[in-house]
């Protein structure tokens, strides 16, 4: 159940009991249900959504189908990704930060995500990066397109078993940024059995060479 909080009072003291009432009602059904809290991160739900019975909570405004919007009122993929940087401690088994749906494969389709055709989508490299970043964040990987008509490039991204395995690792840790150096961002996600997933992400719009010292840079 996704529970939107449209046109509601801005204070958390009103929001929490409303969401908890629904959370309690869902538990009483005796059926396993996923409870998604959506108030767009305005009341810092990562601090209280678990106690309200939530399993995931939106951390930002709605995502748009553009890599970077450069518009404070229209959040692109990169704007949303950057807003997750201080939230890792709140994610874990049973409760997840939700940076919104995947835009992978939309290519400007969707009236809302494209803002009525204003945004034409991303290229394949950007979509691949988007999917990997959301996997590293331990975010819910919720597809936002008609899978019956997706092209091969989109299917190859969304069905990548190794990336999905990183996202679904049972430890449930959200990746943290180790450093950003000359437009290269390095993220570390702890996995069960002491393993690590490392993401070397080029934030720039040009190819770049980068060397990672596993002994020095990962500490």
Residue ranges and their predicted role:
Residues 1, 28-34, 52-54, 193-196:
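Loop/turn elements at helix/coil->beta-strand transitions in domains of secreted/extracellular proteins
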Residues 4, 36-38, 199:
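A cross-family glycoside hydrolase active-site/sugar-binding cleft signature
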Residues 12-17, 126-127:
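Soluble non-cytosolic domains of exported or imported proteins
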Residues 17-24, 28:
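Alpha-helical scaffolding segments of alpha/beta enzyme cores, especially the outer helices
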Residues 34-145:
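Glycan-recognition surfaces
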Residues 129-179:
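Catalytic cores of secreted or luminal carbohydrate-active enzymes
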Residues 134-137, 142-144, 180-219:
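Carbohydrate-binding surface patches
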